[in-house]
């Protein structure tokens, strides 16, 4: 049928737009996209499935159409933004709640009737004291529901905009809505007709001539509108006019008295509301006077019950005399009672004024913020009057209305929304809490007129007007309603119990519908999984082409169909078919894996679409992130311009000429250049010769030619080193050499003995080594660098037993090694003994010679061992003799020094002495008493020097010294063997008179005595030796004076040498 096809097309278009809104919440739909929905001829109920659009427009149709349509359009715009925010991936921080005191919300959404109902459709169903919020158990909003409601809000806002612009394709829509509203108003007026006829017999007439009889008040609707405001374009009764125009923004409006109003009943606006006389036609006795052919409009209205406190008020009253709430106030719940039982109301405050809840300051009615603390006005929780002391607040009713009150309180009435039979006064249903029109269902058996003719009842004791009186209705209807109420309360109890356990109300209701169990929560835990599996299996059997169904899809279908198994299977199949069609329209059919994606993601189309898109883009992602080298293009193509454009665009070269230069270098034969190297070089220069040199730099170590950007260069020199040589050199230096050997492999710079160059060099070398070395080698570099820094600390010590270094900050001579836990002397490096305590190192050594049998057994070898070699730079001790080469290389700090005088050895061109004659060779500057020179003396000459200065020396082994097995010198030396270096005894022949030592070690023994006693060997120099020493130290060739004899010449040279080159503390050996 055409109607069904139009409805189907409308739903398809509507679902497409909702899906687009879910995918992109910020998407703006054009008028062309919305036209299929706007041009539809379906009724409003079929076009707006969630939103009650007709009621929303009718409830706000007051005044000029353009004014209220603009107001409604603005409110819908804000509501649309609420929906889009809920659909956005980055929702606002406080998306879960909406505050009523928000100025934007209060001036737009809350200014129209039905705005809060739209928020409840979004999911804001939890009532808060100051707003609405999502339920606590709901972590995320229902995207489908939110998208559908947002689309309908958007559609209605667009329709209203088109109506205002007179461009709506169905312009008669607004007229139809307004005609329906007029018909509804007339229907409600006709419903009052029987009641009015019963109260006041006579025809119910309405004024036919405008202005002949004033209409009802625009604000309260109960009293006649006797005052007309041209600015507001509304008619108000005097009481409402006083309240409405008391606002500062409307205080300047001028009002006019409508014609046909008696001047006696007109109230001056200058009088307060409490001083205004009541209209004369409000007496209830006057309603029964048959002489009145037409009732006064004011007397055609009934006394009204307050919906909050059930107080019976007179017809002309705008606010309830008990709780100060307006006549149109909806039914409210109990509030928190104050200390006087007034529910927190303050009767001392003037009507309309309000007290700040923070500072209790009394503010004017028009004030929005407190005048003292500037905090906003908060809504007061409503309450019922429950204390007997509140009777003083209520005005005593008229004696004539007491009979009407008794009759009205004995009435029962049906709610027009839920058809519940109510017996309490007022028109707020106790079941659905909604207000109904005041149409009593049953009347008292006697008419009001007969009861009124008997005169007023006798006055009695005052009674509470707010207490409802019990009444009864028909037994069958009452029983039916009681049963419905009992079942409803039971269902509500089950739902609350389920929500406490994490089950939603739909699950509880569906469980009851499916199983009829009395314990639905237990059934959901035990039986629901099997039911869902059965639904999924039956759905798969019904249409095997749709693939397997997930339990999530079965669950949603089962809940949507309220537990009906067959309908759930149909819904599951229908939903899956629609989702497959949606994915297929997007380019993903079943052959692309759409069925499997839907199953994996529980039927979620957006997640399934994301998965399918990810699978389709996977080859592109792999190709994009592939770490392999890019294919090298061919540079021999005939289209040179195309190649130049490619270089210019892809590699961002500075100019067209640079791109042509790069292409010419790439086309040269032989082709030894890489593309990246050429591009990098061309960016720095455009000189072809310079670029060729830049692209062919030779390694200073191996001679391999590489581009300059691949070479490594140190900051200390201009040598260029290829990556392989750089990595290999520094790896070997780290693993097999000292930290000071990490210099340039080509030129050997810088000199790492200079502390000023050391810091700057290693700071830049660290960055280069991090990118070139292996992680273990780089870690070793940092370890050695740290040790080198620690060795420069003046409090650094080397253990004399295990060669472990540590920082020793104590002042005592006794130090304990943290590694081997051996104790030794800080100064002499000998193993600590109790005899050393309180003695100097020299006294302790003499004590060892005289009292230690082991020391005596070793003889002079122990003396030489104790007077071993100490590195002057790092203080590391070597228990070795000085025989052999005097050039010593410290294994710890790589310092080169003389083992006799501890002066440094200098490499080629490193000597700081400006007048040095041997600067171009490895050399050292020794004092004249150094073993370096005295080892050439004979033992007898050394003995003579000691004898001349009365120094005792040994010529025979000390008493108790043991001989070495096999004979030979027993002094320990470091000897080079095929496997490395080894410490062992000297083993050379020991001549007689040499104290059991070989000739070299006996000379070392004698020289150590000469150095210990600071003896100057120059006293035994011959003339030739004096001239050589003078030339060596003073850099001049001495000549004898004229007539100077040789002895005088020798004495003069000796005096000059000893005075100008003394043997003082400048010798490093004496400072150790």
Curated annotation (Swiss-Prot):
Instruction: Give its E.C. classification number.
Output: 2.3.2.31
InterPro entries registered for this protein in UniProt: Bbox1_RNF31-like, BRcat_RBR_RNF31-like, IBR_dom, PUB-like_dom_sf, PUB_domain, Rcat_RBR_RNF31-like, RNF31-like, RNF31-UBA
List ligand-binding residues for Zn(2+) 6.
Answer: 898, 901, 916, 925
Impact of altering residue 102 to D? Answer: Abolished interaction with OTULIN
Q: Where is this cross-link: (Microbial infection) Glycyl lysine isopeptide (Lys-Gly) (interchain with G-Cter in ubiquitin)?
A: 735, 783, 875
Q: Which residues form the PUB domain?
A: 71-142
Binding residue positions for Zn(2+) 1: 699, 702, 722, 725
* Binding residue positions for Zn(2+) 3: 799, 802, 817, 820
One GO cellular component term: cytosol
State which tissues express it. Expressed in both normal and transformed breast epithelial cell lines.
Ranges for region Polyubiquitin-binding:
1-485
Subunit structure, as described in the record: Component of the LUBAC complex (linear ubiquitin chain assembly complex) which consists of SHARPIN, RBCK1 and RNF31. LUBAC has a MW of approximately 600 kDa suggesting a heteromultimeric assembly of its subunits. Associates with the TNF-R1 signaling complex (TNF-RSC) in a stimulation-dependent manner. Interacts (via the PUB domain) with OTULIN (via the PIM motif); the interaction is direct. Interacts (via the PUB domain) with VCP (via the PIM motif). Interacts (via the PUB domain) with SPATA2 (via the PIM motif); interaction is direct and bridges RNF31 and CYLD.
Which family does the record claim for this protein? Belongs to the RBR family.
Q: What is this protein called?
A: E3 ubiquitin-protein ligase RNF31
According to its UniProt entry, this protein's organism is: Homo sapiens
The major lineage groups are: Eukaryota, Metazoa, Chordata, Craniata, Vertebrata
The gene for this chain is RNF31
């Amino acid at each position: 049928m055409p109607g069904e096809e139009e409805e189907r097309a409308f739903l398809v278009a509507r679902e497409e737009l909702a899906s687009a809104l879910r995918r992109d919440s910020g998407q703006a739909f054009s008028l062309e996209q919305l036209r299929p929905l706007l041009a539809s001829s379906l009724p409003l109920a079929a076009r707006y499935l969630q939103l009650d659009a007709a009621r929303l427009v009718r409830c706000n149709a007051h005044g000029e159409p353009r004014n209220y349509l603009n107001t409604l359009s603005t409110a819908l715009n804000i509501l649309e933004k609420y929906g889009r925010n809920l659909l956005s991936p980055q929702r606002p921080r406080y998306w879960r709640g909406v505050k009523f005191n928000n100025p934007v919300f209060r001036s737009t959404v809350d200014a129209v009737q039905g705005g809060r109902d739209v928020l409840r459709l979004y999911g804001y169903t939890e009532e808060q004291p100051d707003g609405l919020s999502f339920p606590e158990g709901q972590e995320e909003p229902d995207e489908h529901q939110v998208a559908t409601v947002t689309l309908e809000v958007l559609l209605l806002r667009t329709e209203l905009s088109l109506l205002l612009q007179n461009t709506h394709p169905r312009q008669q829509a607004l007229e139809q809505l307004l005609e329906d509203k007029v018909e509804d108003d007339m229907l409600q007026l006709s419903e009052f007709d029987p009641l009015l006829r019963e109260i006041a017999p006579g025809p119910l007439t309405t004024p036919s001539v405008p202005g002949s009889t004033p209409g009802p008040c625009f604000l309260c609707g109960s009293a006649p509108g006797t005052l007309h405001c041209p600015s507001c374009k509304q008619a108000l009764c005097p009481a409402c006019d006083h309240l409405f125009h008391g606002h500062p923004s409307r205080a300047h409006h001028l009002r006019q008295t409508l014609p046909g109003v008696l001047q006696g009943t007109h109230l001056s606006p200058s009088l307060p509301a409490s001083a205004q006389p009541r209209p004369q036609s409000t007496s209830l006795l006057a309603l029964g006077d048959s002489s009145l052919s037409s009732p006064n409009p004011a007397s055609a209205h009934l006394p009204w019950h307050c919906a909050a406190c059930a107080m019976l008020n007179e017809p002309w009253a705008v606010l309830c005399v008990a709780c100060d709430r307006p006549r149109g106030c909806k039914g409210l719940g109990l509030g928190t009672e104050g200390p006087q039982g007034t529910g927190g109301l303050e009767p001392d405050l003037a009507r309309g004024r309000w007290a700040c809840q923070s500072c209790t300051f009394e503010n004017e009615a028009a004030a929005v913020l407190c005048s003292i603390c500037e905090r906003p006005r908060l809504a007061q929780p409503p309450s019922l009057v429950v204390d007997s002391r509140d009777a003083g607040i209520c005005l005593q009713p008229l004696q004539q209305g007491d009979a009407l009150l008794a009759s009205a309180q004995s009435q029962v009435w049906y709610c027009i929304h839920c058809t519940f039979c109510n017996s309490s006064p007022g028109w707020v249903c106790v079941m659905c809490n909604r207000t109904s029109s005041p149409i009593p269902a049953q009347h008292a058996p006697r008419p009001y007129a007969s009861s009124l003719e008997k005169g007023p009842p006798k006055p009695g004791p005052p009674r509470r007007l707010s207490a409802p009186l019990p009444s009864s209705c028909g037994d069958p209807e009452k029983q039916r309603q009681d049963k419905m109420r009992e079942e409803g309360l039971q269902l509500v109890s089950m739902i609350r119990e389920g929500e406490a356990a994490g089950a939603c109300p739909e699950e509880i209701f569906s469980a009851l519908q499916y199983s009829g169990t009395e314990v639905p929560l237990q059934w959901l835990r035990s039986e629901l999984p099997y039911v869902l599996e059965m639904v999924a299996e039956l759905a798969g059997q019904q249409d095997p082409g749709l693939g397997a169904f997930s339990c999530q899809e079965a669950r949603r279908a089962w809940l949507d169909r309220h537990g009906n198994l067959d309908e759930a299977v149909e819904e599951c199949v229908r939903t899956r078919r629609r989702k497959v069609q949606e994915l297929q329209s997007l380019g993903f059919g079943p052959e692309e894996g759409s069925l499997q994606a839907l199953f994996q993601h529980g039927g979620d189309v957006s997640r399934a679409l994301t998965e399918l898109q990810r699978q389709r883009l996977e080859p592109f992602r792999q190709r994009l992130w592939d770490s392999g080298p890019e294919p090298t293009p061919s540079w021999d193509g005939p289209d040179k311009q195309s190649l130049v454009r490619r270089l210019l665009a892809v590699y961002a070269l500075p100019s067209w000429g640079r791109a042509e230069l790069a292409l010419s270098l790439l086309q040269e034969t032989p082709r030894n250049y890489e593309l990246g190297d050429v591009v990098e070089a061309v960016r720095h220069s455009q000189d072809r010769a310079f670029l060729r040199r830049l692209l062919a730099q030779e390694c200073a170590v191996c001679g391999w030619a590489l581009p300059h950007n691949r070479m490594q260069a140190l900051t200390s020199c201009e040598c260029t080193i290829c990556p392989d040589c750089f990595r290999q050199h520094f790896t070997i230096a780290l693993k097999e050499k000292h930290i000071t050997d990490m210099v340039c492999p080509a030129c050997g710079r810088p000199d790492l003995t200079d502390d000023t160059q050391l810091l700057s060099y290693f700071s830049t070398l660290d960055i280069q080594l991090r990118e070139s070395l292996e992680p273990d080698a780089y870690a070793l570099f940092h370890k050695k660098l740290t040790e080198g820094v620690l060795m420069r600390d003046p409090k650094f010590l080397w253990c004399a037993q295990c060669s472990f270094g540590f920082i020793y900050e104590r002042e005592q001579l006794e130090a304990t090694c943290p590694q081997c836990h051996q104790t030794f002397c800080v100064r002499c490096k000998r193993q600590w003994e109790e005899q050393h305590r309180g003695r100097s190192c020299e006294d302790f050594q003499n004590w060892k010679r005289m009292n230690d049998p082991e020391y005596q057994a070793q003889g002079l070898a122990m003396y030489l061992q104790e007077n071993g070699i100490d590195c002057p730079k790092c203080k590391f001790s070597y228990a070795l003799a000085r025989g052999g080469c005097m050039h010593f290389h410290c294994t710890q700090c790589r310092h080169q020094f003389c083992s006799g005088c501890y002066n440094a050895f200098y490499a080629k061109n490193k000597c700081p002495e400006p007048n040095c004659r041997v600067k171009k060779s490895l050399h050292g500057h020794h004092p004249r008493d150094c073993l370096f020179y005295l080892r050439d003396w004979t033992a007898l000459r050394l003995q003579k020097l000691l004898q001349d200065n009365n120094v005792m020396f040994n010529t025979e082994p000390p008493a108790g010294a043991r001989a070495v097995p096999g004979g030979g010198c027993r002094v320990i030396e470091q000897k080079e063997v095929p496997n490395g270096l080894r410490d062992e005894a000297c083993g050379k022949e020991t001549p007689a008179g040499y104290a059991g030592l070989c000739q070299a070690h006996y000379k070392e023994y004698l020289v150590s005595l000469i150095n210990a006693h600071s003896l100057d060997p120059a006293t035994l120099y011959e003339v030739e030796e004096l001239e050589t020493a003078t030339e060596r130290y003073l850099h001049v060739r001495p000549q004898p004076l004229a007539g100077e004899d040789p002895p005088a010449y020798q004495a003069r040279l000796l005096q000059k040498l000893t005075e100008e080159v003394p043997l003082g503390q400048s010798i490093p050996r004496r400072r150790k």
